Swiss-Prot record:
GO biological process, one term: GDP-mannose transmembrane transport
GO terms, molecular function: antiporter activity; GDP-mannose transmembrane transporter activity
One Gene Ontology CC term in the entry: cytoplasmic vesicle membrane
Protein name (record): Probable GDP-mannose transporter 2
Topology of this chain in the membrane: Multi-pass membrane protein
Family, similarity comment: Belongs to the TPT transporter family. SLC35D subfamily.
Organism: Saccharomyces cerevisiae (strain ATCC 204508 / S288c) (Baker's yeast)
Length: 249
């Protein structure tokens, strides 16, 4: 999950990456039905469809920006155009793999917390310890470990950023385990999706990400779907309370 996330960011623009992460919510929602029972309400399903639509709109905006950029270059041959557009293709493949692995990770984590009665610290510890060997293996096999590359990527600024990122990751891991334990996998993923939308907007403002109507509209749809899910969740909780009160009578 962590490795495919990094590879996705290597090829995809920040807004596209963050919007596509929302596709995982649908997999998790129906995965919870299979793992834990229950159902997905029509309003929840509508919010998921809107999230998918936001991802599709984001893709259109990304492709549109690439086409405009390619057509504006002078003396551009066909090979350069194909190489420019191809940069997106492996990114989408990595993103699809990341969606599947992320959904399985959250569902299995909640299942394991229930079975073993893990505390939040235990969840954080085992998540990171089990992931470390796989990350090391893939890093040695797939990445460039030449002296030149190490000198560029292991500068003082890069090391400081890695340390800060690592410390923040510890906090994220702990809070993730806590959120999954006290709420649900779907709610955890939806909150995470809403957290990423401001980052997607920041990518449009501060980074060299494609800026067009479709990019901004996709972010708007993402926010709207998150609000709709929150309303759907509140209604679902109220219905469960009414049903429980009826059964008690």
């Amino acid at each position: 999950m962590i490795y495919t996330s990094s590879k996705s960011l290597q090829y995809l623009a920040v807004p596209i990456y963050t919007i596509f992460k929302n596709l995982t919510i649908i997999l998790i929602a129906y995965g919870e039905v299979l793992f834990f029972g229950g159902k997905v309400t029509s309003m929840e399903l509508t919010s998921f469809i809107m999230m998918v639509l936001s991802s599709v709109v984001a893709t259109w905006g990304d492709q549109q920006a690439i086409a405009i950029k390619a057509s504006s270059l002078e003396d551009l041959d066909q090979e350069l155009v194909e190489s420019t557009i191809f940069v997106l293709n492996p990114g989408y493949l990595w993103m699809f793999t990341n969606c599947i692995s992320s959904a399985l990770f959250v569902l299995i984590m909640r299942k394991r917390i229930r079975l073993t009665n893990f505390k939040d610290y235990d969840t954080m510890f085992y998540n990171n310890v089990l992931a470390l060997p796989l990350l090391l293996v893939f890093s040695f096999i797939m990445e460039d470990w030449s002296t030149k590359n190490l000198s560029v990527n292991l500068s003082a600024d890069s090391l400081a950023a890695m340390v800060i990122s690592g410390l923040m990751s510890v906090g994220i891991s702990y809070c993730s385990g806590w959120c999954v334990r006290v709420t649900s996998s779907t709610t955890y993923s939806m909150v995470g999706a809403l957290n990423k939308l401001p980052i997607a907007l920041a990518g449009l403002v501060f980074f060299d990400a494609p800026k067009n109507f479709l990019s901004f509209f996709s972010i708007f749809l993402g926010f709207l779907s998150g609000l709709l899910y929150a309303v759907a969740k509140q209604k679902k909780i109220q219905q469960q309370k009414v049903l429980a009160a009826t059964l008690e009578k």
